[in-house]
Every structure is written in C-alpha cells, then in structure tokens.
C-alpha cells in the first residue's frame, strides 16, 4: 500500500502546485482526491454522467480535459458568478494541446481528472441546490451504483442535507444506528418503488439490503 499512498500524494502535490490558477478549488480538489482515491474511477464516472444529465458538462467533454483547462486558465472559479459560468469559460476560451495531453504523466492525468471532477461536482451542487459531501459520492461508489444513474439522481434528491447524507454513507458502511438505518432504508425503498413499480417487495428489499456493504 505504501507506493499507492506515495503515488496519490504525488498527485495531490501536483494539484497544490497550481493553486494560483485554481484558487480555493485547489484545496477542495486535494481533499476530494484524498477521500475518493480508492474509488476514483467509479466516483468520477458517476459524477461525469450526472453532469451530462444535468447539463453541467457536454457528453463529449471529459473530466480530465476540464481539469486541464482549469489548471491552465488565468481565471479562478471565484471570478465567476457560478461554477457553471466557470465551466462555460473553460469550454469556450481555454484550448488544450492534444500532444501534451496524450504525453502527460499518469500522475498529471489523475490530478487533472480530480480537478475536473471537483468542478463538475460543484456544478451539480448548483443545479441541485444542495451541497454534496465527498463521502456521499464515495458511498454511492461503494454501493455499486455506477451505471445506475436514475438511482443516483434520486438519492441526491432524497438525501439533501449533510446529516441525511451522513446517515446514507453510514448505512452503506454498516455504521448507521437503528433509527438512522430505518430512515435510510425507508427512503431507499421509496426510491426503488418509484423506479420499479412492478418489482416485488422482496426484490426491492434485496436491492436496499445489498447497498449495506457490511453484510
């Protein structure tokens, strides 16, 4: 595990090194990387697809490119009224060198992806009118929700405040108390019933229970 920790530490250092371009986003992206690193690929895929659905990013835009443009731009997120305006600026005004992108180190590619994911996540928060904790993204990855975007979308709409998101993450980790577990399972049951009205109660219960990865 040592070399993996060193690798992600190096990626984090790359993010910190461009803090002048990213402003406050640098520390947010650094924390994002630290928390999601074991699930980075799954989390970034979930964020990317939700970003597409909500119009935060275009289907042909990838997180690495968005992050690379942010690290290259002389304007920071705080120079704009919203993250969605910032993303529009990156899309329209910052160009990338294709050869440089292809030849970038693995560490730099991951740093750019982490920055891009953080930016799109913030854009999703604006669209949803809520804050989304990094632990919530990780919990959805742990719960096996990659590719189950309808479920992810409704989870975000259902567990909107910090305490609700914490209860959901604790449920996935098998750490929720009895009361919290009951609240979370009831909400997840309602989500699945709305998506699969013809599914049996047993099938829905299994889907909900399968999200508790401690069992």
Where are these regions (language model features)?
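Short, intrinsically disordered N-terminal pre-domain segments
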Residues: 1-14
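Short acidic DE-rich linear segments
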Residues: 1-3, 209-215
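Membrane-active amphipathic alpha-helices enriched in small hydrophobic residues
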Residues: 11-57
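Amphipathic, membrane-inserting segments
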Residues: 51-206, 214
